[in-house]
Amino acid sequence: MMSETNLESLEDFIDTQVLEAWRGPKKVPVEEFFTSGHRTCQGCESAQLMKLMAKAGGPRTIILGSTGCMYVANTTYYSTPWAIPWMHTQLGSSGSAATGTAAALRVMMRKGKMAKEPINVIAVCGDGGGADMGLSAISAALQHTQYNLLILMYDNESYANTDIQVSGSSPWGANSTFSPPGKVRRIMNRRWKKNTAAMLAAGHPDCKYVATVNTAYPVDVMNKVRKALSIGGPTFIHSLDPCPKGWDYDPMFAHELGELAVETGIWPLYEVENGKFKMYGKSQRILSGQFKRKPVREYLGRQGRFAHFTEEDTNYFQSKIDAMWEEWLIPGVIPFTNA
């Protein structure tokens, strides 16, 4: 077993870098590290997320991609879009792969086989590989505080790569391959969406940074990625990504749906940094009363997966969102109420 002294002697090899926030799009460099050559669907916001993430990390970044949409669509033979090192890992092992890669880099630097320099380790996974099958590996990774890494979950609210099966992130009532509305039972998926980011933030007090993002707000995405890579230790970011195939919408509305998810209060934008909670953008304005939440029907009505909703279903969905902001201990985030 390694002694505390030896553990402390390795601290020099946990290099972090200072990635300053970009103040507006004009400050963002033009160089791209996720380029043409991918095979994502038109209107896929997860592809936009990969582009923003890679740009935020820069050239000294290693990407680990678990099985999912962003693996299959980005690894067509001889046409990868990645201009930085990338490795495939199994569906539920993004956390394990990130920890192992960060540990290997540390050993190589300690043995003098690599120059001591900050190298970003980012593991990406979908909601199936993150909120479901890979949750235990992510939890374990967030407890290894000696390693610098970021786990980024792109959440399109289904197993979209294998034809839109229900995941733990699928919203209540949504039509999917495994939850089609029927004549006897109209609502087949009766579970509310898993609150992954808040769950990981609350359950891992040593994790310095957990955040939510949405590609409709690209500068916010990049700055949160840069903060996660700079703070030191394992971090987690949860992105809500509209999916034209699974959500059944015209690709031209992808960006607008991302905005509506925030403006209706369905998807709060926040971060937990060193245990301190902070809302961002319109979510902060909703919390302070400066912005009135839009009705959820504006969001639901743009998507074919909710086309079977009756007025009763829409009102129920609205009541759940109202409760998130009006009754929860931390509005929109922590689903506890005072006794």
Language-model segments: what does each one mean?
Residues 1-6, 13, 241-339:
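Flexible, low-complexity linker and terminal segments
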Residues 4-154, 158-160, 164-174, 189-190, ...:
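Cofactor-binding active-site loop characterized by glycine-rich and histidine/acidic residues
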Residues 23, 39, 60, 106, ...:
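Arginine residue identity/basic-tract feature
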Residues 48, 60, 64, 207-208, ...:
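Short secondary-structure junctions and interdomain/linker hinges
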Residues 117-118, 132-150, 154-292:
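Glycine-rich ThDP/TPP pyrophosphate-binding loop and its adjacent helix/strand module
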